[in-house]
């Protein structure tokens, strides 16, 4: 099935709801991107909470609006905390999102992520290599880097979405968002987004937060991808390189006006 182009008008409408709700988003993410992830959510209007201790993570997941599990710096003790939080979220019907960082390259995290799939994530966000590996169609990748184009992983993403009954996001130059039956494409962004650490991980947090919104999950998640792409483009226009890109990106998210961006493109 061919992907449809995501509607920016819908993304603008969704952003208004997102800012009004300010989803409390429980981020169990990797050590490298904690600050950037929290600042990304804050800039868009969400409320991040970086609760990782096993004693606290389980009860907090039940009161949050959304949960993110990112396995980038996975350890055995952190895996236990994440599993407890996911079980709590599942019982409380809190939507949770999986970011299977480098899942095709390392066996421990691959087995951990596969085990978590039985607890029905609302969304999965990864690059092409990660989605191919999680679906069982291929292993590999270079850590957080992909060795495949996003479009090459689309059949795997669609199959995984049908298998788990969730939204799957494959990110790249064009992002693809699918529920297994319908697929949306989101072009845009800028190559500078790949020259700093954390844009993909931060997107996963925004995806997680968007899953707390009412309405169609496919459209909400695609809107989250659209916001990040638009902010990346705007930030790149005002940046001289990676160092100046990061603050410009956060400013672009804070001032994001999808309707205005739509009118100028």
From Swiss-Prot:
The keyword Metal-binding applies. Its cofactor is Mg(2+). Belongs to the Thz kinase family. Its EC number is 2.7.1.50. It catalyses: 5-(2-hydroxyethyl)-4-methylthiazole + ATP = 4-methyl-5-(2-phosphooxyethyl)-thiazole + ADP + H(+). It comes from the Bacteria. The gene is thiM. GO terms for biological process: thiamine biosynthetic process; thiamine diphosphate biosynthetic process. CDD domains: THZ_kinase. Keywords: ATP-binding, Kinase, Magnesium, Metal-binding, Nucleotide-binding, Thiamine biosynthesis, Transferase. Substrate binds at residues 50, 198. Pathway: Cofactor biosynthesis; thiamine diphosphate biosynthesis; 4-methyl-5-(2-phosphoethyl)-thiazole from 5-(2-hydroxyethyl)-4-methylthiazole: step 1/1. One of its GO terms (molecular function) is ATP binding. Coiled coil: none annotated. The keyword Signal does not apply. Catalyzes the phosphorylation of the hydroxyl group of 4-methyl-5-beta-hydroxyethylthiazole (THZ). ATP binds at residues 125, 171. This is Hydroxyethylthiazole kinase.
